[in-house]
């Protein structure tokens, strides 16, 4: 199978390395210098340093070439750009006049200005593209790059997209499950990043494992309420792309969103934290969108509200936690 991966960040690079072990894979990035480095060293020293990439993996900075590769009859196109760049990439694909027949995206979050999920952005920009879906689940790019075991879910209303994605990714140490709840999978992948910031704050303040467990559990309830209101199925949120991804992102030391929370608890400013990370922390980008959607649906999301207070309103982390503890008692 031919596979084009659009986006050479940590996640796109790790997935491309996995795919290249079995398929004719081309990794694209618009940054010519990044591509030149990949071609010379077979390592993404900027985003996934220390991980050797397969010799068979090819690289290109020309979008047209990547799209042509991913538009072959037996091909798959993987969109690994962040949500913030998704609409621009879709427009570039449309302008290039070469939209692949089968597309799967791996980005997580809501578009900041519109509060749209990735599938809604793609439907608006590429309305003729009908075989598409989302690949998500509890996964750190570095571990995938190291070939460690991982389980992911592809969700699509298109059986052709599910089958093509399964055939591409399900090999080696990667196990793929299939489903059709695109909204539920996307909401889980977006909201868990915000909740991971909350658990990072609690851990950074030394509040203990009891507090962490409470935040994860009540955070899952927030995720489920919002996801169901937006059209997702409740059972999706107890699976890999909901609870599974939440546990990993809230507790794993490789989690950028958890790191943001830890550093906020240590008194660092958000700007300094993001500057030092050098990578996207989607929980920061989509926290306000999550809260706005919750309010539009009249859904209570106190943990998300507390995170937004710390990120954007100058609320001290300890005061935000105190506010959660002062909430009225209620039935679970």
UniProtKB/Swiss-Prot annotation:
Binding residues annotated for sn-glycerol 3-phosphate, in chain numbering: 108, 137, 139, 192, 245, 255-257
Active-site annotation: 192
Residue sites binding NADPH per the record: 11, 30, 108, 141, 256, 280, 282
Sequence similarity: Belongs to the NAD-dependent glycerol-3-phosphate dehydrogenase family.
EC code(s) of this entry: 1.1.1.94
GO terms assigned for molecular function: glycerol-3-phosphate dehydrogenase [NAD(P)+] activity; NAD binding
Protein name per Swiss-Prot or TrEMBL: Glycerol-3-phosphate dehydrogenase [NAD(P)+]
One example of a Gene Ontology biological process annotation: glycerol-3-phosphate catabolic process
One term under GO cellular component: cytosol
InterPro entries, alphabetized: 6-PGluconate_DH-like_C_sf, 6PGD_dom2, G3P_DH_NAD-dep, G3P_DH_NAD-dep_C, G3P_DH_NAD-dep_N, NAD(P)-bd_dom_sf
Function of the molecule: Catalyzes the reduction of the glycolytic intermediate dihydroxyacetone phosphate (DHAP) to sn-glycerol 3-phosphate (G3P), the key precursor for phospholipid synthesis.
Natural source organism: Burkholderia multivorans (strain ATCC 17616 / 249)
Reactions catalysed: sn-glycerol 3-phosphate + NAD(+) = dihydroxyacetone phosphate + NADH + H(+); sn-glycerol 3-phosphate + NADP(+) = dihydroxyacetone phosphate + NADPH + H(+)
Predominant location category: cytoplasm
Pathway in which the depicted protein is active: Membrane lipid metabolism; glycerophospholipid metabolism
């Amino acid at each position: 199978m031919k596979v084009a991966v659009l986006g050479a960040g940590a996640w796109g690079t790790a997935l491309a390395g996995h795919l290249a072990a079995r398929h004719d894979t081309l990794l694209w990035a618009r940054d010519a210098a990044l591509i030149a480095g990949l071609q010379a060293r077979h390592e993404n020293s900027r985003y996934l340093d220390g991980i050797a990439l397969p010799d068979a993996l090819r690289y290109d900075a020309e979008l047209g070439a990547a799209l042509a590769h991913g538009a072959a009859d037996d091909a798959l196109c993987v969109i690994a750009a962040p949500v913030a760049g998704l609409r621009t990439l879709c427009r570039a694909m449309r302008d290039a006049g070469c939209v692949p027949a089968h597309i799967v995206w791996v980005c997580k979050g809501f578009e900041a200005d519109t509060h749209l999920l990735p599938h809604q952005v793609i439907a608006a920009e590429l309305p003729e593209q009908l075989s598409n879906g989302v690949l998500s689940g509890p996964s750190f790019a570095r571990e995938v790059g190291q070939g460690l075991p991982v389980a992911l879910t592809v969700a699509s209303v298109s059986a052709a997209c599910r089958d093509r994605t399964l055939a591409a990714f399900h090999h080696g140490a990667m196990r793929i499950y299939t489903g059709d709840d695109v909204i539920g999978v996307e909401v889980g992948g977006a909201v868990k990043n915000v909740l991971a910031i909350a658990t990072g704050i609690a851990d950074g303040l030394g509040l203990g494992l009891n507090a962490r467990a409470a935040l994860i559990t009540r955070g899952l309830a927030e995720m489920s309420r919002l996801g169901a209101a937006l059209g997702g199925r409740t059972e999706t949120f107890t699976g890999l792309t909901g609870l599974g991804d939440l546990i990993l992102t809230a507790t794993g030391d490789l989690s950028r969103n958890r790191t943001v929370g830890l550093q906020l608890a240590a008194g660092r400013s958000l700007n300094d934290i993001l500057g030092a990370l050098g990578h996207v922390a989607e929980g920061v980008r989509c926290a306000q969108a999550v809260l706005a959607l919750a309010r539009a649906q009249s859904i209570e999301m106190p943990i998300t509200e507390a995170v937004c207070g710390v990120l954007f309103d100058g609320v001290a982390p300890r005061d935000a936690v105190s506010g959660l503890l002062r909430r009225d008692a209620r039935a679970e």
